[in-house]
């Protein structure tokens, strides 16, 4: 690992047993979520029990929401009395790298942006139970961001279905639990039971969708006259509007001037300001369904593909 700046020391209680200490030694390269950026924290601050709210342990969507409020850090060293972790937000500089263990069932390729999701795959356990301390470490799974986006979309769809189950199909939907990535078949076994996280995701999703649809339709209707005029000279717009007519062919020869657009006039909103707002919210719709990438795989002189269980050198995501 190249030298970086900030590191967090996570204190290990003195009452830990030897088997539990040995289990911690195997956690190098895994990710924990820090509640705050500090030099000194305790193991209880990053354990799964710290995510419990009101005596209720969060389900998969609840963990996703909690991840957004915390700071990911990669465990770089495990010493007898403390764990050294590198916060990815402040500890990993643009010139530094850390080694991230690939605990996902898929390969990580050089250049892949990596997102973190809770354990969601069938037959995969990422928990480390420390019986002597009565604590559990539940590590997230690093996945390529495109795969993580699809998984989160499936989890939200399952949660929405649970909010309004169909009496005609009381069972589960098997299609939502199986997906394919790079030729591999992956089975999801996620815990989506609590309605609070589903309502939070659904509220953001519906508000963004309603805004994008209504404002996008208004902007398209406003731009239609100009699109028709541009179709006389632009083959792509021409095909888009399907103007296969003699009028189109004549217009291509005449080259009419496109009508000028007024910013205000009789319109409800200034056109270009509305277009900027719509593009911004359309991008936020994707951000609602996926965690942003935290790092990028960067293999300098090693293999370009990092297999499951191996260490992947990663750099800060730009």
Swiss-Prot record:
InterPro entries named in the record: Herpes_capsid_2
Entry-linked Pfam families: Herpes_V23 (PF01802)
Superkingdom to which the source organism belongs: Viruses
GO cellular component: host cell nucleus; viral capsid
Alphabetic keyword roster: Capsid protein, Host nucleus, Virion
Location of the protein in the cell: Virion; Host nucleus
Subunit structure: Interacts with TRX1 and major capisd protein/MCP.
Stated role: Structural component of the T=16 icosahedral capsid. The capsid is composed of pentamers and hexamers of major capsid protein/MCP, which are linked together by heterotrimers called triplexes. These triplexes are formed by a single molecule of triplex protein 1/TRX1 and two copies of triplex protein 2/TRX2. Additionally, TRX1 is required for efficient transport of TRX2 to the nucleus, which is the site of capsid assembly.
Protein name, per record: Triplex capsid protein 2
This protein's encoding gene: TRX2
């Amino acid at each position: 690992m190249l030298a970086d700046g900030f590191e967090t020391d996570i204190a290990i209680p003195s009452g830990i047993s030897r088997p539990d200490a040995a289990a911690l030694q195997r956690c190098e390269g895994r990710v924990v979520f820090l509640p705050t950026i500090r030099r000194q924290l305790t193991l209880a601050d990053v354990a799964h029990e710290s995510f419990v709210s009101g005596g209720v342990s969060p389900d998969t969507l609840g963990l996703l929401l909690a991840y957004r409020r915390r700071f990911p850090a990669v465990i770089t060293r495990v010493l007898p009395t403390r764990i050294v972790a590198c916060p990815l937000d402040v500890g990993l500089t643009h010139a530094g790298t850390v080694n991230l263990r690939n605990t996902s069932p898929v390969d990580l390729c050089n250049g892949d942006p990596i997102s973190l999701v809770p354990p969601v795959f069938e037959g995969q356990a990422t928990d480390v139970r420390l019986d002597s301390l009565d604590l559990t470490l539940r590590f997230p799974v690093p996945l390529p961001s495109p795969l993580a986006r699809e998984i989160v979309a499936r989890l939200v769809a399952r949660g929405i279905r649970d909010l309004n189950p169909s009496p005609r199909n009381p069972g589960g939907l098997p299609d939502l639990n199986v997906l394919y990535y790079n030729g591999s078949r992956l089975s999801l076994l996620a815990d989506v039971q609590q309605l609070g996280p589903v309502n939070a995701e659904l509220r953001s999703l519906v508000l963004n969708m309603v805004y994008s649809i209504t404002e996008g339709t208004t902007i398209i209707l406003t731009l239609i006259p100009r699109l028709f005029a541009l179709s006389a000279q632009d083959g792509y717009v021409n095909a888009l509007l399907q103007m296969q007519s003699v009028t189109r062919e004549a217009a291509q020869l005449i080259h009419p001037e496109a009508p000028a657009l007024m910013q205000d006039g009789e319109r409800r909103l200034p056109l270009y300001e509305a277009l900027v707002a719509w593009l911004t919210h359309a991008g936020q719709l994707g951000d609602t369904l996926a965690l942003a990438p935290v790092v990028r795989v960067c293999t300098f002189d090693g293999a370009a593909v990092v297999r499951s269980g191996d260490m992947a050198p990663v750099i800060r995501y730009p």
